């Protein structure tokens, strides 16, 4: 899985990337205290990191690909310092409270976090890896952490992930505390391979802690 992910970034096969940021984040993100620590797993080079930091939060993304991490800072125009700790490379932005940790997410143990934003992590993982991801993620969060999860729903018989379709029953089994807050049709942001496969419905489901 890790090798495949790195290869996609090396080849520029990043059809899931939302260059303009995520609409659902801006519509549904809960208001938190300034300085709240927000965790963004498997963040890629998402501009959502910058948006969250601009709201006054301390944002930490975790990403396997160094190509993605360096691209984020270059595109955002933010200088950074680098530290290496425990096999992970910490890219610490010199503007805003914004850090991206480069390495294997399962080796990342910094905690606790006040909030979680997951748009591209759970849906990137095949079913057999999801429970381990969720267990590890929960270990990094405060017991009362606010959480926002975005899943995708589409006809997976026509095309497979990643990103994968994750159905509501599975979400509730993994995260009973999450409630579905709304849906957005995301045909404009649909990866090209799904459009080529003839998929006509592609929904982002937004889940929040109540």
Protein language model features and the residues they cover:
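A short, conserved alpha-helix within the catalytic core of class I
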Residues: 124-136
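Gly/Ala-rich phosphate-binding loop of Rossmann-like dinucleotide-binding domains
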Residues: 53-54
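Class I (Rossmann-like) S-adenosyl-L-methionine-dependent methyltransferase catalytic domain
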Residues: 1-35, 45-48, 61-98, 102-109, ...
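Conserved acetyl-CoA-binding loop of GNAT-fold acetyltransferases
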Residues: 57
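Short alpha-helical basic/polar micro-motif
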Residues: 50, 119
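A short acidic, Gly/Pro-enriched loop at the edge of an enzyme's catalytic core
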Residues: 109-116
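Class I SAM-dependent methyltransferase "Motif I" SAM/SAH-binding loop
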Residues: 39-46, 121
């Amino acid at each position: 899985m890790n090798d495949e992910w790195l290869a996609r970034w090396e080849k520029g096969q990043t059809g899931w990337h939302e260059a303009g940021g995520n609409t659902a984040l801006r519509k549904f993100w809960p208001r938190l205290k300034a300085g709240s620590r927000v965790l963004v797993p498997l963040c890629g080079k998402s501009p959502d990191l910058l948006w969250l930091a601009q709201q006054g939060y301390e944002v930490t993304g975790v990403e396997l690909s160094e190509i993605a991490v360096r691209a984020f800072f270059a595109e955002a125009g933010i200088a950074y310092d680098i530290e290496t700790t425990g096999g992970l490379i910490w890219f610490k932005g010199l503007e805003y409270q914004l850090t991206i940790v480069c390495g294997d997410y399962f080796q990342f143990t910094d905690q606790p976090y006040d909030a979680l934003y997951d748009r591209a992590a759970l849906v990137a993982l095949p079913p057999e890896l999801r429970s381990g991801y969720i267990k590890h993620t929960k270990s990094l969060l405060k017991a009362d952490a606010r959480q926002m999860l975005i899943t995708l729903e589409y006809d997976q018989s026509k095309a497979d992930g990643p990103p994968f379709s994750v159905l509501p029953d599975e979400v509730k089994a993994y995260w009973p505390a999450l409630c579905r807050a709304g849906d957005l049709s995301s045909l404009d942001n649909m990866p090209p391979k799904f459009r080529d496969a003839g998929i006509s419905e592609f929904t982002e489901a937004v889940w929040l802690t109540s």
